[in-house]
A protein has these predicted regions:
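Bacterial N-terminal signal peptides that target proteins for export
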Residues: 3-20
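Cleavable N-terminal signal peptides
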Residues: 22-23, 33
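Outer-membrane beta-barrel porins/channels
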Residues: 36-49, 94, 100-101, 106, ...
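Transmembrane beta-strand segments of Gram-negative outer membrane beta-barrel proteins
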Residues: 39-55, 73-91
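Sec/Tat signal peptide C-region and signal peptidase I cleavage site
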Residues: 29-35
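Charge-dense polyanion-binding interfaces
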Residues: 80-83, 87-103, 108
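Active-site/binding-pocket entry motifs
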Residues: 57, 86-88, 248, 395
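Outer-membrane beta-barrel pore proteins
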Residues: 56-58, 63-77, 121-126
Length: 431
């Protein structure tokens, strides 16, 4: 994609050419599982990720576009490029089932390592106007069960899903005055999805399109939405922020027999509030609140129990994964230890999106972790360059099924669990 000269002067376009080339390269890469709050990433940008994803009222690097585009007004001109190693551990247990061979432990770790790139660029083009571009993985989910959990009821080969979401977000911010800034980002979204080993659900009466439930290769979808942001300095040392992102329409045609509304898979609306307090020149405390509206997307929010009342997979109000809306609270601290070194730490907690009676289908998407702890640093190399690193640990969480397996599948319960370790590094250059 290109940015219109209406927004950027010719010298700025010249400076953007390497960024636009990187856009094309990054768009061609796989953007696999990348999630801690349901299937949304817990933050964007290495500096934010080191402080539990806090960013709405604490702009630190150019990836703030993904959280609050108003924040680019405080960054000047800079380029940030990062790479994350995401290592989830996901598994399931089936117990108390009456079908021979169904009970047991199943590992979804057929693929263990996921490399996730990100890129952000901002440029101040006028005293009150800044523009930018961010390329990042919004989220995703991956499971690969070499031993198919549904094998005893007709599943063939290995089982699992892979969901990838890449956002390309050009943005602009405008300073209304010294205290208040507004920002907007256009979210251009590309999604990819595949599923395999789900033959038990590819039956007449269970699916409206049984041939489009499983093993259809990779299906793609593109859509667009918008993110709005506000950043305000209300008192010395205090900043508040607010952000809202629209729903992005999506549909996986090859899996129109799996997802409700004929393959519909929208990215849900979400919004958030943030606050930061620079307690001293060295210490900053910050917090974010985020609300993700998973239940508004039928393929994600509708319960599997709709199968029992005519809501077959793929139908207009078909069965889904039964996810609930969630609230996320993020807390963090940044300490500028010296002119060279800044240290960060943070903690976040999210509601549980998966109810205990919805665990059977969520063997495929066990996004159950709720709490994670983070630490990070930035080392300033010189007046222009800096290196950032971070680590995040999502604590192990198990959701035990209660009334989770229908009698038609032999009854009993499915338990799902996950934990995550995340490592990242980024390089930033200030112009």
């Amino acid at each position: 994609m290109t940015l219109s000269p209406f927004f950027i002067s010719p010298p700025s376009l010249q400076a953007l050419r390497p960024t636009l080339l990187a856009t094309a390269v990054l768009a061609a890469l796989p953007w696999s599982a990348h999630a801690t709050n349901g299937y949304f990433a817990h933050g964007y940008g290495a500096q934010s990720l080191g402080i539990a994803g806090v960013a709405i009222a604490l702009p630190q690097d150019a990836l703030v576009i993904a959280s609050n585009p108003a924040g680019i007004s405080q960054l000047g001109s800079r380029l940030d490029a990062g790479l994350t190693l995401f290592r989830p551990e996901r598994s399931a247990t089936v117990r108390g089932n009456g079908v021979p061979g169904f009970n047991g432990e199943y590992s979804g770790d057929g693929k263990k390592n996921f490399w996730i790139p990100e890129l952000g660029y901002t440029r101040a083009i006028a005293p009150k106007l800044s523009v930018g571009l961010a390329i990042y993985g919004n989220g995703g989910m991956n499971t690969r069960y070499e031993r198919n959990p549904f094998g005893a009821i007709g599943g063939q080969g290995r089982a699992g899903v892979n969901l990838e979401q890449i956002f390309v977000s050009p943005a602009a911010s405008y300073k209304l005055n010294e205290q208040h800034t507004l920002g907007v980002a256009l979210n251009l979204v590309h999604q990819r999805f595949s599923a395999e080993g789900l033959q038990p659900f590819a039956q007449a009466g269970t699916s409206s399109s049984p041939q489009q439930v499983t093993n259809q290769g990779t299906s793609t979808s593109s859509g667009a939405g918008v993110r709005l942001g506000w950043l305000g300095q209300l008192a010395p040392g205090w900043q508040l922020g607010a952000t809202w992102s629209s729903k992005v329409d999506g549909s996986f045609h090859r899996y129109r027999g799996l997802f409700a509304e004929g393959g519909g898979f929208d990215i849900p609306e979400n919004w958030g509030l943030g606050a930061s307090w620079q307690a001293t020149p060295e210490f900053t405390l910050a917090a974010d609140y985020q609300r993700i509206l998973y239940s508004q997307v039928k393929s994600v929010g509708n319960p599997l129990s709709k199968l029992l009342s005519g809501g077959s997979l793929g139908s207009s109000d078909g069965a889904g994964f039964g996810w609930r809306d969630i609230d996320v609270l993020k807390l963090g601290v940044s300490w500028r230890q010296s002119d060279k070194l800044t240290l960060r730490a943070g903690y976040s907690h999210a509601d549980q999106p998966i109810p205990s009676d919805q665990t059977l289908f969520n063997v495929l998407a066990p996004g159950v972790v709720q709490d994670h702890l983070t630490a990070g640093f930035t080392w300033r190399l010189d007046a222009h360059g800096e290196v950032t690193g971070y680590y995040a640990h999502a604590f192990s969480k198990t959701v035990k099924g209660q009334g989770s397996i229908p009698a038609s599948f032999g009854g009993g319960e499915a338990d799902v669990r996950m934990k995550q370790n995340i490592f990242g590094v980024a390089y930033g250059w200030k112009f």
